[in-house]
């Protein structure tokens, strides 16, 4: 399976471990970054993962930031994405079987790597169970998505990147 993976600078090592694990399981990975610990922001990488999945370049996605909250919210803004922030196998399976989630998010500083791998395995093994009720819920959720023209601009994050270059952000 082709899986897009992305993270922010806080959890780069955790993302690398997930990528390595998925490769050992025979999956093809689209590594959307980030690739080091240089300060950045999660929306950039959530957007990249979301676009890879929504375009069909990847079948599913995994996003990771410190708590998982920010990057999961960011990836959910990409039209066609249904992402779930998960911390256990039950939630991951539910998100796939009932809501047809195509991205899962993790808090890399909240959950350990081995558990994260187990949850990813459970998510990948789960299959969407289409029912009339599930289809209605998904249609309702999807109807809430409206892409803005600004979002398609390749310079969408430039103002923030310029601030980082000027040293205006501090951890």
From Swiss-Prot:
Main enzyme class: isomerase
Disulphide bonds in the chain: none
GO MF terms, alphabetically ordered: galactose-6-phosphate isomerase activity; ribose-5-phosphate isomerase activity
Keywords tagged on the record: Isomerase, Lactose metabolism
Reactions catalysed according to its record: aldehydo-D-galactose 6-phosphate = keto-D-tagatose 6-phosphate
Any one GO BP annotation for this protein: lactose catabolic process via tagatose-6-phosphate
This enzyme's EC code(s): 5.3.1.26
This protein's pathway: Carbohydrate metabolism; D-galactose 6-phosphate degradation; D-tagatose 6-phosphate from D-galactose 6-phosphate: step 1/1
Gene3D superfamilies: Sugar-phosphate isomerase, RpiB/LacA/LacB (3.40.1400.10)
InterPro entries membership: LacB, RpiB_LacA_LacB, RpiB_LacA_LacB_sf
Keyword Isomerase: yes
HAMAP family assigned: LacB
Subunit: Heteromultimeric protein consisting of LacA and LacB.
Protein family (similarity comment): Belongs to the LacAB/RpiB family.
Protein's recorded name: Galactose-6-phosphate isomerase subunit LacB 2
Source species: Streptococcus pyogenes serotype M18 (strain MGAS8232)
Gene designation: lacB2
């Amino acid at each position: 399976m082709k899986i897009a993976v992305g993270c922010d600078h806080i959890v780069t090592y955790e993302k690398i471990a997930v990528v390595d694990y998925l490769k050992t399981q025979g999956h093809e990975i689209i590594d959307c970054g980030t690739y080091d610990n240089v300060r950045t922001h999660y929306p950039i990488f959530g957007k990249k993962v979301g676009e890879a999945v929504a375009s069909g370049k990847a079948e599913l996605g995994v996003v990771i930031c410190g708590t998982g909250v920010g990057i999961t919210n960011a990836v959910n803004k990409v039209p066609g994405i249904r992402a779930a922030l998960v911390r256990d196998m039950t939630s991951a399976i539910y998100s796939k079987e009932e809501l047809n989630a195509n991205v899962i998010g993790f808090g890399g500083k909240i959950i350990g790597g081995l558990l994260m791998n187990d949850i990813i395995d459970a998510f990948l093994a789960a299959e969407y169970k289409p029912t009339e009720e599930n289809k209605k819920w998904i249609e309702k959720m999807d109807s809430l998505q409206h892409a803005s023209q600004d979002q398609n601009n390749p310079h969408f994050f430039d103002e923030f990147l310029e601030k980082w270059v000027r040293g205006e952000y501090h951890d």
